[in-house]
Amino acid sequence: MERIDHIAIVVTNINHAVNWYTKNRDCEVIYQDKSWAELQFENIKLALVLPQDHPAHIAFVDESLENGTKHRNGTESIYEHDTFGNIIERIKYEQDNRS
């Protein structure tokens, strides 16, 4: 069975969005920079992204992924569209960097 890694939603201001979610919801910030932030909830991660830097999407862990784009946090991923045009990210973690 596949596992959903995170859902990414578009916001217009990362700091404002992080402040709102951490103040109004029970979550913690696990990563934040100028273009995106990642919040950990009990059962899922929520990515807050800027529209000019990242698309809104849903990410699934895919340990069989090969030849994806490598990211500075040790993950590898590719983006694709489902049959309805929604953006899907397939993401693979390094063995020692699993979230």
Language-model-derived ranges and their functions:
Residues M1-E2, A8-L46:
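Core segments of cupin and vicinal oxygen chelate
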Residues H6, H57, S77:
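Conserved beta-strand and immediately adjacent loop positions that scaffold enzyme active sites
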Residues H16-N19, L65-T69:
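Short, conserved charged micro-motifs
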